[in-house]
């Protein structure tokens, strides 16, 4: 059904023809950092996705998808489902997830009134913005952000090879595993085993993670389409999106969270602040319907 939605009022007609021809799908996975999916055969999963696509396209009369499988960032989806985001690891065993709301939003009004213990004034915009801090516990045995960059890259390679490419039918480029690689410049690799056999045998002494990742990316350039690479930062700042906490702090905070009843939140008026939406800066959206 998704591939059949090709009537784009805001794009040139050529794009409708392109989307009808390729009928692309984006069947993604998220929560991979919990480790459960790693037990299963991704090639079989991709095969089943192709079979279902073939069955449905025969019934709907559209083209079969040129590319079916992907791994998206899944930031919002992971919050709704309570999972790790896309291919990425969990932040830690226990942490706070901080969300920001305009104080005039109905959900913010409800939380500030009924659950003030979850709310803090934003230190940068205390007059109009509230931070809501939610305690999170990663499932037992989950992959955590403390893993090495090579561990993350090898997981990207595994999904790219067995899930993405297995779901590719035609086209010059495959879909991608969306991933941000955090590199710790203080982490050293001392032997070939440490860096999954990537250290040049002619180099002497340890390599830092930037060097090892650069070498991995070159030698495995067929295993990804694009990657974001950022320095790992183990510090914190006030009201960061993710902040480590202890198990004791988690247990203290989760009691309040269990008492939430969001069915009491009703939106009477449109309180969207278009000034905080990039595409609608200045109060006028770029895309008009």
Label the predicted regions:
Residues 1-11, 19-22, 73, 82-271, ...:
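Catalytic alpha/beta core of large soluble enzyme barrels
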Residues 6-14, 31-73:
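Internal maturation/activation junctions in enzymes
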Residues 25-30:
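Nucleotide/phosphate-binding sheet-loop regions of phosphoryl- and nucleotidyl-transfer enzymes
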Residues 19, 54, 68, 275-276:
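Exposed boundary/loop context
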Residues 272-289:
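Short acidic, low-complexity intrinsically disordered linear motifs used
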């Amino acid at each position: 059904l998704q591939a059949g939605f090709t009537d784009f009022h805001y794009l040139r007609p050529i794009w409708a023809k392109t989307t009808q021809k390729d009928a692309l799908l984006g069947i993604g996975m998220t929560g991979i950092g919990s480790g459960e999916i790693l037990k299963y055969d991704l090639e079989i999963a991709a095969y089943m996705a192709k079979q279902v696509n073939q069955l449905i396209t025969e019934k709907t009369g559209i083209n079969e998808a040129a590319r079916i499988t992907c791994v998206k960032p899944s930031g919002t989806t992971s919050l709704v489902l309570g999972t790790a985001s896309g291919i990425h690891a969990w932040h830690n065993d226990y942490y706070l997830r901080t969300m920001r709301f305009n104080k005039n939003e109905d959900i913010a009004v409800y939380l500030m009134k009924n659950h003030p213990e979850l709310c803090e004034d934003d230190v940068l915009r205390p007059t109009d913005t509230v931070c809501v801090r939610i305690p999170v516990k990663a499932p037992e045995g989950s992959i955590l952000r403390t893993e090495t960059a090579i561990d993350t890259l090898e997981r990207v390679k595994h999904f790219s090879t067995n899930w993405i490419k297995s779901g590719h039918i035609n086209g010059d480029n495959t879909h991608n595993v969306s991933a941000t690689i955090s590199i710790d410049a203080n982490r050293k690799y001392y032997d070939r085993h440490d860096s999954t056999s990537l250290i040049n045998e002619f180099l002497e002494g340890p390599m830092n993670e930037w060097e090892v990742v650069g070498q991995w990316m070159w030698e495995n350039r067929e295993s990804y389409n694009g990657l974001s690479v950022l320095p790992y930062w183990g510090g914190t700042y006030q009201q960061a999106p993710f902040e480590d906490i202890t198990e004791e702090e988690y247990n203290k905070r989760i009691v309040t969270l269990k008492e939430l009843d969001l069915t009491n939140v009703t939106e009477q008026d449109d309180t969207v602040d278009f000034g905080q939406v990039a595409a609608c800066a200045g109060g006028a959206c770029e895309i008009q319907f």
